[in-house]
Amino acid sequence: MSSPNKPIPLDIAIIGGGSAGMALATKLDNLSATVFEPKTAAERDCSWALWAQPQQLEEFSPAIRGSWDQWRLIDHSGEIIHQSNQYRYTSLSSGQYLQHCEAGLKDSVSLVRAPIESIVSQGSGGQFSADGQTYSAKTIYDSRPPILDDNSLRQHFVGWEISTKEPIEHADIATLMDFRVDQSRGLHFIYVLPYSDRHLLVESTMISTQLEDKDWYRKAISQWLTERNIQIQSKLREEYGVIPMVPVQPQNADIACIGAAGGAVRLSSGYGLSTIQAQMAVLAESIAAGEYRVPMPFSKRLVFMDKVFNRALDTQSDHGVELFMATAKTLNADQFARFMLGTAGSMEWAKVVLAMPKWPFIKSALKQFLSHD
């Protein structure tokens, strides 16, 4: 190994070995690249989800835990069920996906299991240290979690993976949002993925600016299960997450950011895996052609519309259930999947806008336009 005082030269350094970092790393070839990630894939294992098409199902197959061609949204008035021939709502093990990526790295790409320290930016690259060794990279991509404002709109949740004493009903349908829960603190719903009729993931999810104590989410999960007479045989694991629903600030403004840190999470839905994968595929092709700039994940129009949608959620949360249910009602399954992924066309957007509660949406649009944000 080189002396810590003599920098190891790299063509590309990728800071963070999550979805974006590893997706890019697996697509690099004939370049000396290193991923810097302190935690193992198993240590970071959690549930990821996306609407997957056949090619993606094949790509993600080593990590798929469940896949459904039906999904639903529920409120006190009833339920909306979608069934798709083009998309499957798919749950992945992030740990298994990252392990698969690590196993597929080319010989020219390495993995350093350590955090990076003290970046000194130099153009698109820079110099930094990790595990006592100094590195000098021509290009750096940072995929570390972004910095979040404590008062920003976020999607936050606690989830339990459980086995049940008795078979559950509707094990062939993913429940994306069940709004029949306490709405007093912001938009709140239960999210349920049945991996089988006795094995499921249940999450209590909030969309608000205020994070709750973890016991609050746990109580909501317990109450939801009790009301449906679902008895837990064993609790397999618990996960906790916070997803930004506003533009994010990178940890280092001088370094190119990718993934969530680069704005690749859809602001109004919290879905980002498909966008991240697409962004990294385009970036890898660009790098092979000698272009290192990170492509924009979403159009300016989509970002504006998401900000309008989220402003309505933030300032008039009592309309939140109506906003999501109206969206699901006006779109068919494939249109809804595209809308949540951020790939909906103009006609689909027009249908959503026309279905929205008019005054809250117009008011939010005007405020967003005048804010110049």
PLM regions with names:
Residues 23-27, 33-77, 158:
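N-terminal FAD cofactor-binding segment of flavoenzymes
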